[in-house]
Amino acid sequence: MKTTVEKLSPTRVKLAISATPEDLKPHIDHAYGHIAEQVAIPGFRKGKVPPPIIDQRVGREAVLEHAVNDGMDGFYQAAVKETDIRPLGRPEADVKEWPGKDLTGDLLLEIEVDVRPEFDLPAYEGLELTVDSVEVTDDEVATELDSLRSRFGTLITVDRPAKTGDFVQIDLTATIGGNAVDTASGISYELGSGDLIDGIDEALESLTAGESTTFESKLLGGDNEGETAEIAVTVQSVKERELPEADDDFAQIASEFDTIDELRADLKVQVGKSKVFGQVTQARDQIVDKLLEGVEIPVPEKLVEDEVQRHLENENRLEDDVHRAEVKESSEKAFRQQLLLDVIAEKEELKVSQDELTQYLIQGAQQYNMEPNEFVQVLQQNNQIPAMVGEVARNKALAVVLDKAKVVDADGKVVDVTEFTKPVVRDADAVSEEPADADAEAVVADAPAEEAAEAPAAEEAPAEKPKKKAPAKKKASEKAADSE
């Protein structure tokens, strides 16, 4: 097999692959065997039909097409390895020349695919970053204390109009064109939380128990999702939350402290820690922006456009040109950021240990309220484990860059970020880049060996087979049926 590569743009190449009859022979043999299992020809058992009979009843063209389809991905993967390109997205294949019916002559393929662009990595040592100063106010501590008190509060029924912060029990009926499309009874809702449909807070404001009103809103789910419906709401009861007194007794009930002053002091520390974390988040965002300012990274247009299209389809906003432009800009920046961190991870020889991957997957499962094994199985089914490994590697790359930076607050005080830039694994055994067949429990279990991978989320090619541009021909089994 011979391969040449033509650079179409900084982010796209064309592979010209020439496969000899010898290269194609194993796939020809496989095609005959597979077709023999499919077709029913009088006088022959399934799987025992000889090639000459298949040629006669099905046609040599069907055999060739089957062989090419069977071998195309292998030829493509071999070409990728031979040319050292870094594919992104789904390749598109075109058969330029078929072997002759006598199985002589080469198979000529042209495959276009987006590739990772080359660029010079900007210097990232000693970058200076300025973040907000940390100052905890009494009001912030009071807000945290009130939040804690609310968790220990009790709901008391009141005979007055509902207001923000009250809990109401309501019945809802949605109608479209005079027909009821959805109903719900006995819903408990905190007025002002915004957890239900648009317009519900305004509609409930000032209503008392037993009163009803109507308003219009778009439905968020069900068969009529996205349609505007008339919503009838009836208030069954209004309750307010009665908070416990902020005293020593409350401190002893709600915490390990004996006095309310000790509890307030601890809440102040917790608010401070949260703000320090905010400083680190600020620094992380700044450092990525600074690095991107210093380098030009070409973006694969088709890859970005496909992502934008998927995003807009999910939001049902395909006609919103302003939003399309916003999503495109965001997608392009995300791609550049991913690629930049991928290259830094490679330069720093960062590895992803099994334990690091496990912790990341467990956190992801918690975010989606799923069991870890269930979450991993979903990722495996969608071949997304390598992408998760890439995410962990990029996070580690960002930690390395942040560790090399100088971070100060607005007052010039140095911000200690070492807690968030712990030493990273650099020389571990490699995690498989194709773990999709792994047992789910093994993926999320603690492992004695540290493993790593070079699997950035954008590099999808190993899991993608070339998509043919040519129209599909009739299946071999259909041809056999036509010839009988």
Swiss-Prot record:
Predominant subcellular localization, coarse grouping: cytoplasm
Pfam families in UniProt: FKBP_C (PF00254), Trigger_C (PF05698), Trigger_N (PF05697)
Coiled-coil segments: none
PPIase FKBP-type domain mapped to chain residues: 165-244
Biased composition annotated in UniProt, kind: Acidic residues: 430-440
Comp. bias intervals (Basic and acidic residues): 475-484
Localization of this protein: Cytoplasm
The entry's keywords: Cell cycle, Cell division, Chaperone, Cytoplasm, Isomerase, Rotamase
Catalysed reactions, as listed in the record: [protein]-peptidylproline (omega=180) = [protein]-peptidylproline (omega=0)
GO CC annotation, single: cytoplasm
Region (Disordered): 429-484
InterPro entries on file: PPIase_dom_sf (IPR046357), PPIase_FKBP_dom (IPR001179), Trig_fac (IPR005215), Trigger_fac_C (IPR008880), Trigger_fac_C_sf (IPR037041), Trigger_fac_ribosome-bd_bac (IPR008881), Trigger_fac_ribosome-bd_sf (IPR036611), Trigger_fact/SurA_dom_sf (IPR027304)
EC top class, as a word: isomerase
Gene Ontology MF annotations: peptidyl-prolyl cis-trans isomerase activity; protein folding chaperone; ribosome binding
GO process annotations (BP): 'de novo' cotranslational protein folding; cell division; chaperone-mediated protein folding; protein transport; protein unfolding
Entry EC no(s): 5.2.1.8
PANTHER family, per database record: TRIGGER FACTOR CHAPERONE AND PEPTIDYL-PROLYL CIS/TRANS ISOMERASE, TRIGGER FACTOR-LIKE PROTEIN TIG, CHLOROPLASTIC
Family label: Belongs to the FKBP-type PPIase family. Tig subfamily.
Biological function: Involved in protein export. Acts as a chaperone by maintaining the newly synthesized protein in an open conformation. Functions as a peptidyl-prolyl cis-trans isomerase.
This protein's domain notes: Consists of 3 domains; the N-terminus binds the ribosome, the middle domain has PPIase activity, while the C-terminus has intrinsic chaperone activity on its own.
Annotated protein name in UniProt: Trigger factor
Organism: Clavibacter michiganensis subsp. michiganensis (strain NCPPB 382)
Source lineage: Bacteria, Bacillati, Actinomycetota, Actinomycetes, Micrococcales
